[in-house]
Each structure stands twice: as structure tokens, then as C-alpha cells.
Amino acid sequence: MPLFENLGFTSHPFAKTNADEEPNLADYFVPPPFFDAVIGDPSTPSASVVLAPRGGGKTALRRMIEENAIKYRFLPVSYDRFEFSTEQNLEDVTLQYHLRNIISRILLAYLSYLADFPDLIRKLDKPNRRHISLFVHTYLGDLTGDKLQDLLKELKGLPSRFRDFWRDNVGFLESFVNILLNKFDLERIDFPDIKQEEKNLTETYKHQLEYLCGLVRNLGFSAIYVLLDKPDETELTGNDPVATYQLIRPLIRDLELLGLEGFGFKFFLWDQIEPTYRLDARPDRVHQYKLNWSREALQRVLSERLKAFSGGKVTSLSALCENGAPYDIDAAVCLLANHSPRNVIRICERIYAVQAEQDATASRLSLSSIDQGILNYCEQVATDTYGEEVVREMQRIGRELFTINYLANDVFKVQANSIRNRINGWVATALVKQVGTVTVPTSKRPLNFYCVIDPAVVRLIYRRVKMEDFLKDLWLPCEFCATDNLMDIEHFPDGNSPVCCGCGRDLF
């Protein structure tokens, strides 16, 4: 019997970290910050930008907006696949590129719903029926059954019956246009006429969107929500935030487009693009939200997941620990996850993997598998994020609080300027943060004081300390801003009060 069954689960609860790969996400979804604000009011839709780190819940939020589409009466159109020709580069990506992709998806979603009401299109007058036929020829003309299925996978907000309908009625290599023309009794348009009409269409993309919105409203929807996600995951953007923003810039900076009546453009974006986006941003016109999960919220995420995968039998990791947990394991996992729902799953998966290696027949998690799994995760995420050399430097420093002079004189034995440059690099990657200044007897002026703020790296610095002692000695929640500080206050020089890394207020 698999370990997950021994532990009381019906399936592996930590096998997937990508929200798009979790078919039952709604069963254990915990609304992230600003969930209601991002959905907004479909009767008066508006554009919004959601910024979050990778693994911060952007795609889960998008999925749940899709899930609520019928309840709120809007048509969800996901746009998370960006295809490029062989010679195309980011400089070639224009507003027209995006609008053509968006119109294709809206049209397919509209026609899918029409499959339930084919008489609606037959009742339209001849000019409107020809207009729809032209849309079909222009935007879906090259679709065959295989390409159609790829596009339908992207439109995750469509009820599954529509995907099943098209799969059953369009052959793998069959022309989708022919099926549509026959099903809806639409006019066939000759190739020369199509080319001439296409030329006219390309000059009126926004008018086309307004026209499609009118058709969609005839189906009973209040608005169209365009949900743009994953622009940082293409072959042309990768890990480059500047390239990522360049891809979406023609779309996100067009305020006329984003303000189109009947449309709600929702952007789910990697937060590393923010410095570049800020140059164009108009927060007075486009609402902007940052997803920042508290530890308590992550504990709810973890608990709901455990319950969903166990039929309600398992509610916490601590309950799975053999001989009782000497500390709150769920809180520790969510503390070290650094505000990331995905990291919560990654830590739990590491614990599960270590336990399976130790004893796959166990019905409880051993304390050693929990501690080792957490350390394995910390090593992996720290190395992936900052590189092996930086991790070695942090462990060489041996503490999370320091001044430039301390590192220069007591640790690395180099000039202060060399350390200053190194610290600037750590600050740029959000590994280290300045937490005010301190006074010391050896300096006439206050010295900048720095703290390692990535909890995974702090755990590696103190890896020889038992987890329960690590939490007892270093974990200092701030009563003002709820920041979970991990610091040994003994490292604050005499006469200097320990302060919070988040708000800078005194911790005592």
C-alpha cells in the first residue's frame, strides 16, 4: 500500500504544485488576498493587475475566477499561451498580435455556448450572419481538430461539455470552419473576399471586440473577462522580467483598450516585472494588487488541502507526527514557505519523500523525516534562488544579523567596499534587508544593520540547531505588522533595541 494511503489520504496530496494541473482545486481553494476585488462587478467590469512571486497563487486565483463565471454571469476567456513563429522576436509583438489571439479565444468561447442555442444565430439578420461567418473564416480558418483541442485546453473556464462536444464532432485533422458553417448554417465566403475583408478587419480590432461583446451579452452574460496569465513562461521570456514585460507591454499600456465597455482585462503577473511596469503603470486607471500570503492564511491552505485529500480525516501535519509533535509543524512549514502556497506543497513533498525513503509502511511521519525534509527543501530552494556560492557565504557568516564592518573584519577579512558591493547584490535578490542602523563603541557614526530575511536561508545558517529550539529562540512575530521575524536578538549590539524587519518598530 502506498505511503499516502497509510497516512490516511485517498491520493498523493503533494504530487502537484501547479494550479492548472489540479482538477479538484475548488475543493480546497482558500481565497487569496483581494479575491473579491479582482473579480469586481461584472455589470461594470474594470481592468486589474495582480502581482505575485512565482508560486504565489496567481494561477489558482485565475482558476477560481473562471470557476465563478456562471455565478457572476461573465464569459471567462483565458489567455496564457503565447505562440511565436520561427523568426519572430519580442520586438515583433504588437497590440494586433495580442488582439488577434484574444478575439480568436472570445469567438471560440462564444460559439461553444451557441452550441446549446443554435437557433440564436439563425435568427440574426443576414448582415450579422455574414459578419459572424467572416469572423469564423478570419480567426478560426486554419484550425483543424488537433489545433482546436489545444486551444480548448486553454479556455479552462468553458464547461467541460463544450470541450466534449467539439472533440466528438470535429475529427483530428478535420477543418473546424466547415463544421461551424454547417452547424450554424453560415454563409461560405470566397477566398478573395475573405482577404479583402480581413484587411478591413485588422484596422478595427477594438470595434470587433465591442461587436463580440454584444453577441456575448445576447447569451445572457454581463461582460467578458480576459484573463492573461503566464507571460513569463514562454521561450522568449523565460526568467527575464524585462522580456516578460516587453511581451505584454503593447496590451497593458493601452488604456483605451483596457477601458472598453463590457470588458474586464485581468493580468496575473510575476512580481519581478514591477520595476519595469511601474514606468508605464496608471494605478489611477488600472487597479493593482499584490498577493502577500500571511502564515495564518497558508496554514488554512494546508489544512484545507489535507482535508480534501483525506476525506476530512486529516486536518494538520502535526496530527500525523508519531508520538506527538514537539512543536507546531504546520506553523513551521508555513513560516519557512516564505509567503508562498507552492512552497508549502514543496516542503510537504520533501517530508513525504524522506519518510517514504525511511519507511514507506509507516502510518505516521517520523520527526526525523520532518526535520530532514525541511532541510532538504531549504537547501534546494536556497541554491536554486541564490546559487551555491551565496549559500556557502551565508553559512560561513553563521548569523542572520550583521554590519558591513563585521563581515569585512571578522568574517571575510576584506575591504569594506568589497562587502558593501556584495551586500547590495544580496539586497537586490531579496535575500537581505537593511533593518535600520546601530551604534557600536568602535564607530563614531551609526552603522547600517542588515538581516537575512529568507527563512529557508536562516534555517540553513542554524541547521545544527534542533527545529524546536530554532523556533523558540529565533521566531519573533511582530504584534504591529504580523511579520514573522527570524532573528537572534543577542546579535543586536548592546544598547540597540531589536526591531521588526517589516515595519521597523521595536519588538519589545
Predicted regions and their residues:
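Short amphipathic alpha-helical interaction segments
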Residues: 413-429, 433-436, 491
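Winged-helix-like regulatory helical subdomains adjacent to P-loop NTPase cores
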Residues: 331-420
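Walker A/P-loop-proximal flanking segment of P-loop NTPase domains
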Residues: 1-96
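P-loop NTPase nucleotide-binding core
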Residues: 53-222, 474-480, 484, 496, ...
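Amphipathic alpha-helical segments of the small helical/lid subdomains adjacent to P-loop NTPase cores
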Residues: 2-9, 126-135, 292-346, 351-355
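Short, amphipathic alpha-helical interaction segments positioned at domain boundaries
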Residues: 446-484
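P-loop NTPase catalytic cores that bind/hydrolyze ATP
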Residues: 94-116, 129-131, 222, 327-361, ...
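The catalytic "switch" region of P-loop NTPases
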Residues: 204-326
